[in-house]
């Protein structure tokens, strides 16, 4: 179980066995059933979660009442609400929900602080993870502005090749910022070509 998260985090820093043991000792394993809301809008996010198995979505509800998916998290990826900080008092602006039965390795802000004190090189790894997340978010924003819906769908398939087999089509449409009907037309055109 820890092999997955150790491999993922060691891509950024070559940790010693002792550092990884400290990291592993601060994580806890949690199984969550599908369709479980892990974070509600307005709540404080109290976890960083590594997906061992399963699929999760992060979304918000727009002014018209539509769900807008911001992120999918599948195996070997992290999910949290980084938009919320201890300096804000409004709480989270998003929901985090499991799509499938999901196995997670989780740590709280307190255990993350303990980790950074006991194994300071993890700060570099988390900084790199955050920078990568910001780059992905920026690229997605640029794609939404500059690319056609079909180009965005192609990019989505490259980034998340297994998601179309795991989630309803309307979730993918929401992520792409298009209607399910328009996504269906794109998929039909692709099948014909």
Regions found by a protein language model. Give the residues of each.
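Cyclic nucleotide-binding regulatory module and flanking cytosolic helices
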Residues: 1-28, 84
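Glycine- and acidic-residue-biased ligand/ion/polar-headgroup-sensing regions
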Residues: 35, 46, 50-59, 75-76
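Short phosphate-coordinating micro-motif centered on Lys-Gly-acidic
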Residues: 38-43
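A generic structural motif
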Residues: 59-61, 99
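Hydrophobic/aromatic-rich structural module bridging two neighboring secondary-structure elements via a short loop
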Residues: 62-70
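Cyclic-nucleotide recognition modules
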Residues: 69-127
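Phosphate-/nucleic-acid-contacting segments
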Residues: 147-193
């Amino acid at each position: 179980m820890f092999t997955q998260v150790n491999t993922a985090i060691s891509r950024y820093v070559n940790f010693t066995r002792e550092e990884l043991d400290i990291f592993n000792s601060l994580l806890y394993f949690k199984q969550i059933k599908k369709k479980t809301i892990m974070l509600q809008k307005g709540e404080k996010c109290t976890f960083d979660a590594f997906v061992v198995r399963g699929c999760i979505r992060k979304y918000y509800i727009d002014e018209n009442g539509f769900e807008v998916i911001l992120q999918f998290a599948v195996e070997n990826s992290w999910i949290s609400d980084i938009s919320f900080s201890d300096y804000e008092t409004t709480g989270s602006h998003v929901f985090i929900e499991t799509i499938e039965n999901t196995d997670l390795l989780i740590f709280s802000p307190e255990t993350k602080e303990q980790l950074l004190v006991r194994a300071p090189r993890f700060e570099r790894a988390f900084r790199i993870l955050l920078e990568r997340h910001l780059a992905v978010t920026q690229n997605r924003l640029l794609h939404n502005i500059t690319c056609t819906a079909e180009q965005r769908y192609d990019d989505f398939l490259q980034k998340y090749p297994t998601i179309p087999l795991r989630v309803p089509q309307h979730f993918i449409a929401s992520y792409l910022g298009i209607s399910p009907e328009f996504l269906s037309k794109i998929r039909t055109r692709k099948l014909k070509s």
